[in-house]
Structures are given as C-alpha cells and as structure tokens.
Swiss-Prot record:
Keyword Hydrolase included in the entry's annotation: yes
Active site (record annotation): S240, D266, H412
Record EC number: 3.1.1.89
Amino acid composition bias (Low complexity), ranges on this chain: 44-69
Residue span of region Disordered: 1-69, 181-203
Protein name, UniProt field: Protein phosphatase methylesterase 1
Source species of the chain: Neurospora crassa (strain ATCC 24698 / 74-OR23-1A / CBS 708.71 / DSM 1257 / FGSC 987)
Pfam family, one: Abhydrolase_6
Entry-linked SUPFAM superfamilies: alpha/beta-Hydrolases
Length: 454
C-alpha cells in the first residue's frame, strides 16, 4: 500500500469515528515512485484474510512443489538425501509367490544320467527349484535365470502370469553353481550314494550342453516327484544365459510335442559377445560383499541393476549368503571370493563368483541367433532396446520367423523391472501357440461315413 493510500485510509476511519461523512480519496496525477524491493515484500507477504495464496490450477499447488511447503527455520534445506526412508528393503519370502520348493536329487551312477568331472570322478547333484503346479490342462512355464541370478528372479513374474492365466504353472530352477543347487563328489562306497568323500568337489561344469541337460533333467524329475502322468504343455522362458539354455534345449527337441514355444529375454549373440569384453571391468566395480541383506537389496535398487524394488526384495536373497554358509564344502563348487575376507564388516557375499565362470562365456552365446531361428516351436524375443538386434535376427524378424517385443524403459532384467508387461507378453504368446484351442475341420472320410455329401 502506498503512502498516499495509507493517509486516505487513516482519514476515512477517523471521520467515521466522529460521525462525519467519509473523505474522498484525493486524486493525483502523479504516480508514486515504483520500488521493486517494496513490491517484492508485498508479494511475499500473506494474502488478505491471513491465508496463503493457493491456486489449484497451478503446478505450484502440488504437494511435490517446493512453493507450497514452507520449511521451519531449523530444517536443513540442503542436506544430502538419506535414501528412500519410506521404502522398505525387507526381504520378501519365496512363499509369497510359489506353491512349494523342490530338492531333486540325481544319483551318481552309470545309468542315472549323472555328470562326471574332468577326472572321471562321479558326482551327485541336488537340483533346487520353485514350483507352482498347473491346474487341469494348464501350461507350465519353465524358467531359467541368467548367470549369477537364481530361480527367484522369476518370482514376481510368476505371480503376474497367474493373475492373467490362473490355470498356468511355473517351474523356476536354480542352475548348478547358483542359488541352492549343489554338486557333490559321490561316495565310492556302494550303498553310500548320499554321502560325500570329504574331498573337495570336482570342478563345476557350466558348459551350455550341461546346463541344457540339467534343465531337461529338472523337468523330468519334477514330473516324477509330482506324479504327473504326462508333461503339461510347456513354454520355456530364459533370461540372458538362460535364453541360450532354453534355445539349446528347444533345438534338441528332447521335450517332443510337449514344447509349445520358447521365449528369450534380452540376449542376442552379437550384443552378448560384445558385452563380454567389458564384463571383468564391471565385476571389478561391483561390491564384494554387504553388511546386511537389506544393504544388498538397497544396492541393487540404487544402482538400478534391478529397477523394481519389489522384485529386488524377492530375488536378491537368492544371490547372497553369509560367509559361514559359503565355506561349507558342498557349496564350494566355484571360487566365491571369500579368501582374505575374514572380517565381519561385510559378511554377506555373492553365492556365485561370476569372474570364475569366464572360461564358459563364449560357449554360451556362439551360434545363438542361428539356433534360435532354427529350433522348433513358437519363438519370441523380448528386448530392452532394438539396438541389441544383430543382422541375423533383424533379417529373421523381417521374415516373420519370430515375435519381437521391445521394452525401452526396462534395464537388462526385463522380467524384474516390468513383471506385468512381461507377463502380458508371455500369456499372449502362449495363447497364440496353444494347440488345445485349435478347431480342425472334420475329415472327409468321417463326413462320408455319416452319409453326408461332400
């Protein structure tokens, strides 16, 4: 309010108090001098009525806007953020998503299909898997994780699939050297197949052919354990390394007509081979351990390795274990980086030492694109970006040899970052390849036998 207005208001109030007519506001042709500092003070002051001005049509009225929140003087305005205070990093148990867990033991012996080490010492392997059984004639989605992950990588996805296809089943295994699957040296004493020799286990074989054979064995052992008369219709789903494994199994046609199709998540031969060149550099920058399981989950979310906190809270517990547990002889199939870390500052370590798997990297991905296009069954490729396509797959996609879906907003772990969208794509893929929905026309011979004209 200008000085002239103040004088007029004072005179008006005084005349009213004395019962005199109100004075007219003087008219002046001289405008008061504009003072920018005074104007700013007036604009910053409270609005009439003592209430702060609030315009709901303005973005400034949003709760997230700094214009509507006036902090107290003692509040640290420029303090460093302390993370997601309201976001829980508590682990989510596997029972939230799966019906049961299976420990499937493959005995050592010449007729049992057991593996042998380079020194021809028989080994015994106990596969660990998570299962939700299919209902009726529902399909079974069999999933295989990538290197360094576990079967829990597909936990949240399995729940989303069941929401859209309630009769579907999901079988998610831990590959050898991952999760809770263990390989031991079998006893040489007859009748003691469940015991170990007490010696160090043989070197772990992570070749592509072995992993594909493991996947087939897990499917067969699950059928036996669940007393299924026959295999349900199967959709194979593999992420990264798992994509190469399911492609290898599909190309072998060992599952026969039970296999409806296979889906590969974010792995392409050319892109994978290029990425291997920088893998050791990436591993050297990754933390060697964590102070707690919650810290491990928090790191995966903050580093955007996994962009969905619910997925991280579910899958990360399958990647880490206390140092004491990793030092058990039956779990030392791979060097796990425990040496020289006797302190307890970061007792939670990676279950799988990815650097030690380097001898197998090239074997996993060489020829992947060709095998993917040649294998029988429906084919689908889910990518986080079209730049990942190599020449062979680009030509195949133009020829309509497989279905392609791209999620540019996802990271490498597509199924964990976007479980809902991935589930929608997989359920739609199953429906397109579901043979039970096919309606075939009647045979001519049957029509003639019924006396109908053809």
């Amino acid at each position: 309010m200008s000085e002239l207005q103040k004088q007029w208001a004072k005179a008006r109030l005084g005349s009213q108090a004395l019962g005199q007519p109100p004075a007219e506001m003087p008219i002046t042709t001289t405008m008061p001098e504009f003072n920018e500092a005074d104007e700013d003070k007036e604009m910053a002051g409270p609005s009439p009525g003592g209430f702060p001005f609030d315009d709901d049509s303005s973005s400034a009225s949003s709760v997230s806007s700094t214009g509507t929140v006036i902090p107290s003087p003692g509040r640290a305005l420029f303090a460093r953020p302390q993370g997601f205070a309201s976001r829980s990093m508590d682990p989510i148990p596997w029972t939230t998503y799966f019906e049961r867990e299976l420990f499937l033991k493959e005995e050592a012996g010449p007729d049992s299909g057991s593996r042998t080490s380079n020194k021809n010492k028989p080994t015994s392997i106990t596969y660990h898997a998570y299962l939700t059984s299919p209902v009726g004639k529902g399909p079974l989605f069999v999933t295989h994780h990538g290197a360094g992950s576990s079967g829990l990588s597909f936990a949240v996805l399995s729940s989303e699939i069941r929401k859209r296809l309630p009769n579907a089943g999901i079988l998610s295994l831990d590959a050898r050297g991952h999760g809770s699957t263990t390989v031991t040296a079998a006893s040489s004493v007859p009748g003691e197949g469940d015991e170990t020799t007490g010696q160090a286990p043989p070197p772990l074989d992570l070749s592509l052919s072995t992993l594909a054979s493991d996947l087939f064995t897990v499917i067969q052992l699950t059928r036996t354990a669940m007393h299924w008369p026959e295999l349900p219709p199967i959709i194979l789903v593999g992420h990264s390394l798992g994509g190469a494994v399911v492609t290898e199994l599909a190309k072998s046609y060992r599952l026969g007509p039970s296999l409806l199709g296979y889906a590969v998540l974010d792995v392409v031969e050319g892109c994978a081979m290029d990425a291997l060149q920088s893998m050791q550099t990436y591993l050297s920058t990754r933390p060697q351990g964590f102070a707690s399981l919650k810290d491990g989950i928090d790191w995966h979310v903050r580093s955007r390795t996994i962009r969905n906190s619910t997925s991280a809270r579910t899958s990360v517990p399958g990647l880490l274990a206390p140092v004491e547990e990793l030092q058990r002889p039956e779990l030392q199939q791979l060097p796990r980086g425990v040496a020289g870390t006797q302190g307890t500052a970061k007792p939670w370590r990676w279950k799988t030492d990815l650097a030690a798997t380097q001898p197998f990297w090239e074997d996993w991905f060489v020829g992947l694109s060709k095998k993917f296009l040649e294998a029988r069954g429906g084919k689908m490729l889910l990518l986080a970006g079209t730049d990942r396509l190599d020449t062979e797959l680009t030509i195949g996609q133009m020829q309509g040899k497989y279905a392609l879906q791209v999620f540019p907003e996802a990271g490498h772990f597509i199924h964990e970052d976007l479980p809902e969208k991935t589930a929608i794509a997989l359920v739609d893929f199953h429906r397109r390849n579901d043979r039970s929905q096919l309606v075939l026309p009647p045979k001519v011979s049957d029509l003639l036998a019924q006396g109908k004209k053809v």
